[in-house]
From Swiss-Prot:
It catalyses: Hydrolysis of terminal, non-reducing (2->1)- and (2->6)-linked beta-D-fructofuranose residues in fructans. Residues 1-19 form the signal peptide. It holds the Pfam family Glyco_hydro_32C. GO terms for biological process: polysaccharide catabolic process; sucrose catabolic process. Optimum pH is 4.0 when inulin is a substrate and 5.0 when sucrose is a substrate. Its main location: secreted. The gene is exoI. GO terms for molecular function: fructan beta-fructosidase activity; sucrose alpha-glucosidase activity. It comes from the Eukaryota. This is Extracellular exo-inulinase inuE. Belongs to the glycosyl hydrolase 32 family. The lineage of its organism: Eukaryota, Fungi, Dikarya, Ascomycota, Pezizomycotina.
Length: 537
């Protein structure tokens, strides 16, 4: 029998409430987090019938990783989210778990290629990794080994509220391809999409420890054929997981390129400890991804990093949007310390949804990201604080108090004599507690310094400084947009070609800010600070 998850049952199991207080210390006010319990990777991102679906790795029974299920939230604007009942609940939850639902993706099967649709209803189909903690014979008659990871599907006929697992034939991709079948414990994270040109479904999965991606095609989402492999290339410091494959416009025109994203854990960007996400630009013909020559580097220590900070991982893209509207969401945490961050009764938040595009920057095709939230509804029209300085002398100047949730737009001349220019954020009145976001002129790097950001006691690697390359724009200016929430800072540099995302855990009264120029004066400075209101109200 297929397994139907009734919303009323799951609602009771997961403890979903209609009214909830989202005002706990460190609770992000415009970043999604579950009401309670553990969350990690975003899954099944799908825009369908005017609704954005965000599924996510979720433990319905506690604040640490375990009992992994698919949580679910919906939004009409990528800003205001409503948590829904658990979509896929770990099989056997409450007694002996025999199957967990690891990361995956979802599509709307508008042509009913799967045959799951009934009475004219479009089936939504989720493809995910089944993790089997014990060896067993499945309802499909297939046998699996202890700790096996396989790819399975489920479908929904009520726009994603309840799901039926395809027990008659799951898993639909039971094992890694030959000659990699010994990797059955590390074969995961399918990203599925419809490829218009070939009129086929395509899925890319990770053979994690080999730093390889396997690409399959299908006519019906049930029967899959291996068509190519990708990797290993570039960063290989940890396992490859949570891959993506999607097409984006180039320079806002009709030309397009394809992008592969892949998470690494550990082995993130230089200067970080733990997880990170790299990307490749190239061409995809429906079966094979061919990377551009300048997107692949000799050796395995250099990469194109999607984010240069420590807290952006498992980034996933939305199906159901045009390529010009492509949106990604990343998990704003890090496996190095994610289980120990000082939040309760939840752990983890998602980064700001980001609009992705490709632009030619410094003669190279580059992934650029910009915040996609509906800012007009939550951001103040008039700035809390606005100043311009033709010359900002060496030293510091206090800005007005900023509160806990705000956006800073900061620009200045790259020809300044200063060594660094920064803004101290979420600072105490005496600035012994602060987070610094700024620019190193000699190195041409953005930096984010959280060494004195508040509570850093839970992990000995947390109090660190992070850097990302940023060349000044064609007018000789450096431009930063900085989004601050109660427990996070996200820096978007230039056109979005460099981003830095980091969690912080400051004191409640750390609401001060100041501008700091070191080693000389900074020229042509402009700073604007806008308040951002809570999306939970």
């Amino acid at each position: 029998m297929a397994r139907l998850l009734k919303a009323v049952t799951v609602c009771a199991l997961a403890g979903i409430a209609h009214a909830f207080n989202y005002d706990q210390p460190y609770r992000g006010q415009y970043h999604f987090s579950p009401q309670k319990n553990w969350m990690n990777d975003p899954n099944g991102l799908l825009y369908h019938n005017g609704t954005y679906h965000l599924f996510f790795q979720y433990n319905p029974g506690g604040i640490e990783w375990g009992n992994i299920s698919w949580g679910h939230a919906t939004s009409e604007d990528l800003t205001h989210w409503e948590e829904q009942p658990v979509a896929l609940l770990a099989r056997g939850y409450g007694s002996d778990v025999t199957e967990m639902y690891f990361s995956g993706s979802a599509v709307a099967d508008v042509n009913n290629t799967s045959g799951f649709g009934k009475d004219g209803k479009t089936p939504l189909v989720a493809m995910y990794t089944s993790y089997y903690p014990v060896a067993q014979t499945l309802p499909s008659g297939q046998t699996v080994q202890e700790d096996q990871q396989s790819q399975s599907i489920a479908y929904s006929l009520d726009d994603g509220l309840t799901w039926t697992t395809y027990d008659a034939a799951n898993p639909v991709i039971p094992n890694p391809p030959q000659p990699y079948q010994a990797q059955y414990q590390n074969f995961r994270d399918p990203f599925v999409f419809w490829h218009d040109e070939s009129h086929k479904w395509v899925v890319v999965t990770s053979i994690a420890e080999l730093h390889k991606l396997a690409i399959y095609t299908s006519d019906n989402l049930k029967d899959w054929k291996l068509v190519s492999e990708f990797g290993p290339y570039n960063a290989q410091g940890g396992v490859w997981e949570c891959p993506g494959l999607f097409k984006l416009p180039l320079d806002g025109g009709s030309s397009t390129k394809w992008v592969i994203t892949s998470g690494l854990n550990p082995g993130g960007p230089p200067g970080t400890v733990g997880s990170g996400t790299q990307y490749f630009v190239g061409e995809f013909d429906g079966t094979t991804f061919t990377p551009d020559a300048d997107t692949v580097y000799p050796g395995n220590s250099t990469a194109n990093w999607m984010d240069w900070g420590p807290d952006f991982y498992a980034a996933a893209g939305y199906n159901g949007l045009s390529i010009k509207d492509h949106v990604h969401i990343g998990w704003m945490n890090n496996w190095q310390y994610g289980a120990n961050i000082p939040t309760y009764p939840w752990r983890s938040a998602m980064a700001i949804p980001r609009h992705l595009a490709l632009k030619t920057i410094n003669n190279k095709t580059t992934l650029v990201q910009q915040p996609q939230e509906a800012w007009s509804s939550i951001s103040s029209k008039h700035p809390l604080y606005s100043r311009t300085y033709s010359t900002f002398s060496e030293g510091s100047t206090n800005a007005s108090t900023t509160g806990e949730t705000f956006r800073v737009d900061l620009s200045f001349s790259a020809t300044s004599k200063a060594s660094t220019f920064a803004i101290a954020l979420r600072a105490s009145a005496n600035f012994t507690e602060q987070t610094l976001a700024g620019y190193d002129f000699a190195k041409q790097q953005i930096f984010l310094d959280r060494t004195k950001s508040g509570d850093v006691s839970f992990d000995n690697t947390f109090a660190s400084v992070y850097h990302g390359p940023l060349v000044p724009d064609s007018t000789g200016m450096v431009r930063l947009s900085i989004f601050v929430d109660r427990s996070s800072v996200e820096v978007f540099g230039g056109q979005g070609e460099t981003t830095l995302t980091a969690q912080i855990f400051p004191s409640n009264d750390a609401v001060h800010a100041r501008l700091v120029s070191t080693g000389g004066a900074t020229e042509d400075v402009r700073v604007d600070v806008h308040n951002i209101t809570s999306t939970w109200n």
